[in-house]
Design a protein with these regions (language model features):
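Short, solvent-exposed loop/turn segments at secondary-structure junctions
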Residues: 1-6, 11-16, 71, 76-83, ...
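Phosphate-binding site of ATP-dependent enzymes
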Residues: 1-41
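General "foldedness" signal
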Residues: 19-22, 38, 75, 87-89, ...
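A long amphipathic alpha-helix within ATP-dependent nucleotide-binding catalytic cores
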Residues: 25-82
Length: 115
């Protein structure tokens, strides 16, 4: 949100028809109440280790997101190295059924569009 990371969305153990997911706050506390889990998006373990490069990744995400009202920054940590994936401006075409309506409403309140 204009260069301010608000949460970390973790995807792991990706398979052909599913990927485990969990949302964390910036202090690395899991928030399963933010997600709608399903067969396609099952709950990841609540004790996913904090990435060793999380502070660097959050700084990188903030720098890349600066100036954009909302953007998802995909970063990956593999073997202690950080990799950039993509910047997405309309995650899942805006139809993110894997988040609760309450979470989406709160996220939407953080978006400030230029007039």
């Amino acid at each position: 949100f204009d260069g301010r990371p608000e949460c970390v969305y973790v995807t792991m153990n990706r398979k052909k028809d599913s990927v485990e997911v969990m949302t964390y706050d910036l202090d690395w506390v899991a928030h399963p109440e933010y997600s709608v889990f399903s067969d396609h998006y099952p709950c990841a373990s609540l004790d996913v280790p904090r990435p060793e490069n999380l502070d660097f990744m959050l700084k990188m995400a903030a720098d890349l997101a600066e100036g954009f009202p909302q953007v998802r920054i995909d970063l990956y940590e593999v073997g202690g190295k950080v990799y950039f994936g993509e910047m997405t401006f309309t995650s899942n075409a805006g139809m993110m059924s894997y988040f609760t309506p309450e979470f989406l409403l709160e996220a939407g309140k953080k978006v400030t569009l230029p007039l």
